Amino acid sequence: MSIQNSSARRRSAGRIVYAAGAVLWRPGSADSEGPVEIAVIHRPRYDDWSLPKGKVDPGETAPVGAVREILEETGHRANLGRRLLTVTYPTDSPFRGVKKVHYWAARSTGGEFTPGSEVDELIWLPVPDAMNKLDYAQDRKVLCRFAKHPADTQTVLVVRHGTAGSKAHFSGDDSKRPLDKRGRAQAEALVPQLLAFGATDVYAADRVRCHQTMEPLAAELNVTIHNEPTLTEESYANNPKRGRHRVLQIVEQVGTPVICTQGKVIPDLITWWCERDGVHPDKSRNRKGSTWVLSLSAGRLVTADHIGGALAANVRA
């Protein structure tokens, strides 16, 4: 299910409150009973044990909100991985409506818990013990989904470049057509969203608009954008096998690569990859500025999640 980002709105059935959370995990310790441990938090207001989550703030996308809430509730920084489930349940306060919570797997990259008024305890438990500790059926369902695949997956981020006006209205070499005002805003908004997944390296098809989409992220990471001639629409159409091979070469590198390319490349690339590895991808409209979050285990694709954009205030599934 693709996540489409939009401002929260009132509906006839009541308001939808958008939230985001995670199964926060870390490698198991030497005396742990499992390969990974799960963070379970206690909220004194409700006297319950749950997974970390919270409302998505205006101006945030769900992934950015998830990482912020993890830090606020647990004290841990985290990199998101595969999306798990979207949970919806009714809420009565301060208005009647529903809360919609998007959950991800999230690996702790360090931090230290400090008790507070909202969360006063955090415990790390193996998956079976965490399952027994959680008070809510929806949290246990999320954890079950997490346990379906190995925790430690590799993430690959495939981005369609931002908006760049109309080809018909650009008089120069189309390969040099730049981002327009909205496209530049998309490029800036992509930075926190891609960092939420632990982006480390940046690749862009040999088009000005692809490079410009990645420039803010590359500046934030202090890395060079790798130019990729085989991933332009023309080159990929002439030799898709060469383009796919180049993507697989990129994936072999250590880290979380971000690959920015064009609209006629991405659908074929995602379809080929999913068919090769037996994965059902999200449905998507392949909009400019959108992102595919691909999760791999032992070199094989296990999930293909889509995020519709990075600009809007909240999310709609």
Swiss-Prot record:
Binding site for Mg(2+) 1: K53, E73, E118
Residue ranges annotated for the Nudix hydrolase domain, each copy included: 15-148
Sorted UniProt keywords: DNA damage, DNA repair, DNA replication, Hydrolase, Magnesium, Metal-binding
Gene Ontology molecular-function annotations: 8-oxo-7,8-dihydroguanosine triphosphate pyrophosphatase activity; metal ion binding
Enzymatic class: hydrolase
GO terms, biological process: DNA repair; DNA replication
Source domain of life: Bacteria
Binding site for Mg(2+) 2: E69, E73, E118
Cofactor(s) this protein cannot do without: Mg(2+)
Phenotype of the disrupted gene, per the record: 15.5-fold spontaneous mutation frequency increase by rifampicin resistance screening.
Binding positions (substrate): R43, P44, R45, Y46, D48, K53, G54, K55, Y89, K99, E118, Y136
Span of the annotated motif Nudix box: 54-75
Gene3D superfamilies xref list: Nucleoside Triphosphate Pyrophosphohydrolase, Phosphoglycerate mutase-like
InterPro entries on file: His_Pase_superF_clade-1 (IPR013078), His_PPase_superfam (IPR029033), Nudix_hydrolase (IPR020476), NUDIX_hydrolase-like_dom_sf (IPR015797), NUDIX_hydrolase_CS (IPR020084), NUDIX_hydrolase_dom (IPR000086)
SUPFAM superfamilies, A to Z: Nudix, Phosphoglycerate mutase-like
Record field: catalytic activity: 8-oxo-dGTP + H2O = 8-oxo-dGDP + phosphate + H(+); 8-oxo-GTP + H2O = 8-oxo-GDP + phosphate + H(+)
The protein's Enzyme Commission number: 3.6.1.69
Reported function: Catalyzes the conversion of 8-oxo-dGTP to 8-oxo-dGDP, and 8-oxo-GTP to 8-oxo-GDP. Functions in concert with Rv1700 to detoxify 8-oxo-dGTP to 8-oxo-dGMP and plays an important role in supporting cellular growth under oxidative stress.
Family: Belongs to the Nudix hydrolase family.
UniProt name for this protein: 8-oxo-(d)GTP phosphatase
Organism name: Mycobacterium tuberculosis (strain ATCC 25618 / H37Rv)
Organism lineage string: Bacteria, Bacillati, Actinomycetota, Actinomycetes, Mycobacteriales
